[in-house]
Amino acid sequence: MTKVFCKKYHQELDAIPFQPLPGELGKKIHNEISNKAWQAWLAHQTILINEYRLNLIEPKAKEFLKEEMHKFLFEGKEEKPEQFSEI
């Protein structure tokens, strides 16, 4: 499997096997983010969608997730909603 130096985990890990999003952002993620980090983002995204009851049809919800994705993957910020608790 192809390796990538992951910006989130600061180490060489398995790359995402496909470009996860279209456009330049998708290319950047594919080139700089590991599959491990991408899977962690998908889990975190699910928490955000459920806890904030986001409607993904709404542009504001999509923009919010895009901003949170950038923070999570490239800035190392992983903020869970206040009301969230692990089971």
Swiss-Prot record:
Organism: Francisella tularensis subsp. tularensis (strain SCHU S4 / Schu 4)
This protein's GO CC annotations: cytosol
One of the protein's GO biological processes: cellular response to oxidative stress
Pfam families xref list: Iron_traffic
Record lineage: Bacteria, Pseudomonadati, Pseudomonadota, Gammaproteobacteria, Thiotrichales
Family, as annotated: Belongs to the Fe(2+)-trafficking protein family.
Free-text function comment from the UniProt entry: Could be a mediator in iron transactions between iron acquisition and iron-requiring processes, such as synthesis and/or repair of Fe-S clusters in biosynthetic enzymes.
A GO term for molecular function: iron ion binding
Keywords of this entry: Iron
Xref: InterPro entries: Fe_traffick_prot_YggX, Fe_traffick_prot_YggX_sf
Name of the protein in question: Probable Fe(2+)-trafficking protein
Domain of life: Bacteria
Secretion signal, residue range per the UniProt entry: none
